[in-house]
């Protein structure tokens, strides 16, 4: 994955906000702008996170949906993920337009997931909190947590694995099972400093 320049990150965050606000006004999905940098037409995974402003991280989340795999061009995936995070996250009621004045938009661009090989009990040694996000898969169940989540909650590597299992609807110790697949990925994260404010690259460590 090409490194995402800061100006591209700002472009994606502004695009995500515009996609949400336009959809909440008209019910229509916006088209990618004509001035989209050509690099953002590359297929990449992306998540859009909506956080309430001036609220502790553990209770700030208002929506988060995305595409773990590079199935859409990044610019299109960002538009879709932004809209879905606002109106289709099953954990929350749909966002109302007036709420957007108090919501911080965050975009995480993902590297393709990499399967963690080797004995299950060694998995905690092969991930790093502050760098990696995780995907857990077992049978029909799967769950994903972004790299910023364990930082916000103060988890270590084993807790991060357990919570990703829980997110998948599985027992928290399922990461120790041979037939559970665990993938790691990294993300470049960009967020508004405050609603509609300057966009910054989010450092986790």
Swiss-Prot record:
It comes from the Archaea. Transmembrane segments: none annotated. Residues 7-201 form the AMMECR1 domain. Pfam families: AMMECR1. HAMAP family: AMMECR1. This is Protein PYRAB00100. It comes from Pyrococcus abyssi (strain GE5 / Orsay).
